Every structure is written in C-alpha cells, then in structure tokens.
Amino acid sequence: MHLQALTGLATLAVTAASQTLWSRDVDYKALSKELSASAKVYFPGTEDFDAASKRWSNLDKPTVNIVAVPATENDVVEITLDLTQANTLRQVKFANKKNLPFLAQNSAHGAITTLGQMKQGIEIYLNQLSGVKIAKDGKSVTILGGTASKKVTMGLWEAGKQTVTGCCECVGYVGPALGGGHGWLQGRHGLIADQFESMNIVLANGTLATVDENSELWWALKGAGHNFGIVTSVTSKTYDAKIKNWAFASLTFKGEKVEELYETINKYILKNGTQPTDLINWSYWFNIPDLDPTGPIVQILLMQEGVDVVDKAYTGPFQELKPLAVDAKKGVYTDLAKWVGVTTEDGPCQKNGAMNPRFPIYLQDYNPAAQKKAFNYFADNIRGDSIFNGSLVTFDGYSTEGVKAIDSKSTAFAYRNQNILVGPLLSYQSNGTATDEKASEIGHKVRDILHEGTGRDTVPVYVNYAFGDEGPKEWYGSEAWRQSRLQELKEAYDPKGMFSFYAPIA
C-alpha cells in the first residue's frame, strides 16, 4: 500500500527471552563509546528499544539485539550533515568489525519477508536524521535520510514549493525512492527517484560517499537502492507550487458492479495509457458493513488538480452506475492524504501487531473479467467474521506521463510503461502458521488471477510492496542486461552481501 516518519530500510525487536540469543563474545555497550555524546543506543527490555524496533507488519520480521540511533541537532536547528552522517558511518564500521548483520530502519513499513533473514543484528534507527533544507535558489532541497514524507511535503509547501514524495504520510521520503517511488505528482515530474540530484550514502566498506549522475552506482540507486548502502541525505529537485487547489470525489458501489466499473475506468480514465496529467484514480476493495453487510464494496476515488469539483466527464460515467454513496471535497495538495485515508492518524499508519503481507502486480489496463473473478475470490475469503476481514485490495492509477517521459534504460526501475499498481493487502492478527499460510494463499491467488488476465509471462512487481518470494527478475525487470548490470554492481560495491535483507539482487 502507501505510508512516514523517517528513512532507510528496516528492522525489529526481540523480547526479553531473546536476550539469551545474543552473541556472548560481542560487547554491545562498546558501541556507545564509538558514537557522539548525542547519539543513543537502546537495549532489549527498555521502552525505547520496543518503540524503535516496532514494525508495521509482524510477518517474518527481523530480530534485533541492539538499536543504534545516529545523532542530530534538533529539527528546528540547521542540521550538521557531516556530524550526523559520521555517526551512521561509525555504526557500520562497528558492525563490520564485529561481523554483525545490520539494517537501517525508517518507518518500518517494509513488509517483505526477506527481512526475516536478519538475525541477531544491529538496527540503525534513523529517526534523528530528520531535516529539510531548501537551496538558496529554490531549485533543490536537501533531505536527511530519516525524514518523513509529511515533513518534506509540508516543509516545501510552506515555502511555495513541491517535489514528488510518497503519498502515505507515515512513510519515509528516502525508503520508497530507493525502489523508484510513486507519488501524486509523478504525472508531471516522474518518480521520486527521478528527482535525485545527488546523495550521501554509507557503503558496505564503511566509507561515506557522495554519489551523483557521474557515478556508475547512480543507475542502481534509482530502483534497486536498498541493495547498496544507507542513504544519509539526498538532494532532490523542487518545483514552484503553481497550482494549489485540488478536488476529490469518491463513489462507492456494491461488488456486483465490479466488471462495469473497471470497463468504465478503462474507457474514461486510463484511455489506453493516456490518462490526463491532472487526474489520479485509485480504487479500493474492502468491507464497509454499514453500506453492504454481505461483502466488500468497490470504492472509486478521483483526484483532480487545478479545480474545485472533479470534472463531470470523469464522475458522470460512474454516477450512471448508481453508487451506494458519493462524497466530494475541495481543498489543496496537502489534503490529498486525508481524503484517501493515509495520514499519520489513519489505519495504514498504525502499528498494532498485525501481519500485513502484500502481493503487488503492475497492470497496463484492466481486464474486467479478471477483475470480477479476483473480486469474487477475495470477497469469499474476507467477508463477515473472517479473520481477514480487515484486508483490502488497492488499485493506484496515477498519471504516468512524467514517468514515461524518462528513458526506461536510465534507471534500475524497470516498469515505467505500466499504468496501474495493484496492492492486495492481507491484514490480520495471526493465530498460527496455518493462518499465515492461508493469507499467503489468498494473496497469491488474487495476484495470479489478475496476472492470468494480462496474458503476460512475467509478473512485474513493485519492490516496495513485495511479498518476498518473487525474485530479482520480478522486482527489477526480467531483461538479461538489467540483471547482469545489477549483479556486477553488487559484486563491485557489496561483495559480501551486507545490504541484502531487502529484496536482494542475488
């Protein structure tokens, strides 16, 4: 799905009982001596440790012996980049010397099962590496590695600026960008990663490097960046916020209309991959018992830039299908997250102990028959008192003009030609392995049905939503040249595979 508060990769907690699993030959407290006075180290059994290592999804979570927190000055003071990045650097060196696994964590919303391969290691918690500094000429912004998307959005907005960020407020800015990164403004400017001008990154050898378009690593960092280091800051393009107003419309239908609804989206919204730049279309499948107690509904969401009411050319065809409920709002760009339910206060941003595996797939357009088949299967498994009744399927239909304007070979992100990002999300409180296996079965089946409807051989997967069993060809593109280039760069920059817990290249 979508999500903010910091940035990097991911990690999690261990209980008091797991303290017995610690490597007895490692003096973890020695790490404190390696850091500045304002840095922090958290140990199991403390509230700080529990809070810092808590995850959005508890399925196949990593286990952590210690949490190290790089220091910064407080958020209202200009952050000294050299100091904060040096702290991260020392932690990497400590882990290297002790031969310990480590993960950098942002908001901990990564749900990929490969994270569970991180055992008894160090979490580098980036929440203090948070800050936004706009350049004097207003054309770029430097963002520290642990900065939340909301902080970036609001900091720029107050200065009359914008850049492409993730949609969900509780997700970090950098983390999604390392996998490409979708956002509201991508129709105008491209992916989040397309905004990068340079970045500072701690590499596997413990050195801090400044990387830009002149580095061979630049290509890989924009799409497969989780595999190459810890980003401590990034400088990105900014744009004047010339158009401030947005309009929103939601139309909710009984599931029996699913086939007609997606035919309508194909005809009036997608338009064979030419969706208007100022228009965004999402849709959800989920339970709203007050509207339909018999099963999940289909909710169509339309967001349009530069108007106070969504054009009837887009809402009219849906109105003709007689929705159960309709809502309309007007506001500004910063209202979008609230309208679609992904603010820091909304459900997708809460860490409540649930399992939240996702099973993403990209689509060119909708196969209405496949949509109906997938919906019916999903509905049969989440309706009523099912343990999975809090699950949903999301369909993100951003404008893609800005994404497609960039050469597909210029970055490691492989799916610029795709128009729809689908994110089946099985959300539940696990009561055992059998339940986890059933959730996996449901999620995979929904994806399989949609994939069969495309007639394609390969399954294109958004790496930031990945379940974990797909593989490099699905995450990073099946072309042989892409796989070869990534493997060569991995061998050159991380031959020991130190950054291989999130969707590893090899």
Curated annotation (Swiss-Prot):
This protein's pathway reads:
Pigment biosynthesis
What EC number(s) is this enzyme filed under?
1.-.-.-
Please name the gene that encodes this protein: chry5
Q: Which cofactors are named for this entry? A: FAD
What InterPro entries would the database entry show?
A: BBE (IPR012951), FAD-bd_PCMH (IPR016166), FAD-bd_PCMH-like_sf (IPR036318), FAD-bd_PCMH_sub2 (IPR016169), FAD-linked_Oxidoreductase (IPR050416), Oxid_FAD_bind_N (IPR006094)
One MF annotation (Gene Ontology) recorded for this entry: FAD binding
**Name this protein carries in UniProt:** FAD-linked oxidoreductase chry5
The species is Gibberella zeae (strain ATCC MYA-4620 / CBS 123657 / FGSC 9075 / NRRL 31084 / PH-1)
> Which interval of the chain is the signal sequence?
1-17
Write out the function statement from the record: FAD-linked oxidoreductase; part of the gene cluster that mediates the biosynthesis of the yellow pigment chrysogine. Pyruvic acid and anthranilic acid are likely substrates for the nonribosomal peptide synthetase chry1/NRPS14, with pyruvic acid adenylated by the first A domain and anthranilic acid by the second. If pyruvic acid and anthranilic acid are merged and released from chry1/NRPS14 by hydrolysis, a subsequent amidation would lead to 2-pyruvoylaminobenzamide. This process is probably catalyzed by the amidotransferase chry2 using glutamine as amino donor.
Tell whether Membrane is among the UniProt keywords.
no
Keywords in alphabetical order: FAD, Flavoprotein, Glycoprotein, Oxidoreductase, Signal
The family line of this record is: Belongs to the oxygen-dependent FAD-linked oxidoreductase family.
List where this protein forms a coiled coil.
none
- Pfam families reported in the protein's UniProt record: BBE, FAD_binding_4
* Keyword presence, Ribonucleoprotein: no
**Glycosylation-annotated residues:** N205, N272, N281, N389, N431
Q: Report the residue ranges that make up the FAD-binding PCMH-type domain in this protein.
A: 59-241
